[in-house]
Amino acid sequence: MKVRASIKRICKDCKIIKRHGVNRVICINFKHKQRQG
């Protein structure tokens, strides 16, 4: 999980979702997991 000020999709499988007011990137590649904070 990477915590970044600005999150971006790294590949076509990445999805940006909002969970409890926090933007997250979920992907089949676990290295692409990100959280905005």
From Swiss-Prot:
Molecular-function GO term, any one: structural constituent of ribosome
One Gene Ontology term from the biological process aspect of the record: translation
Top-level taxonomic group: Bacteria
This protein's GO CC annotations: cytoplasm; ribonucleoprotein complex; ribosome
Keywords: Ribonucleoprotein, Ribosomal protein
Family from the record: Belongs to the bacterial ribosomal protein bL36 family.
Protein name: Large ribosomal subunit protein bL36
Organism from which the protein derives: Mycoplasma sp
Taxonomic classification: Bacteria, Bacillati, Mycoplasmatota, Mollicutes, Mycoplasmataceae
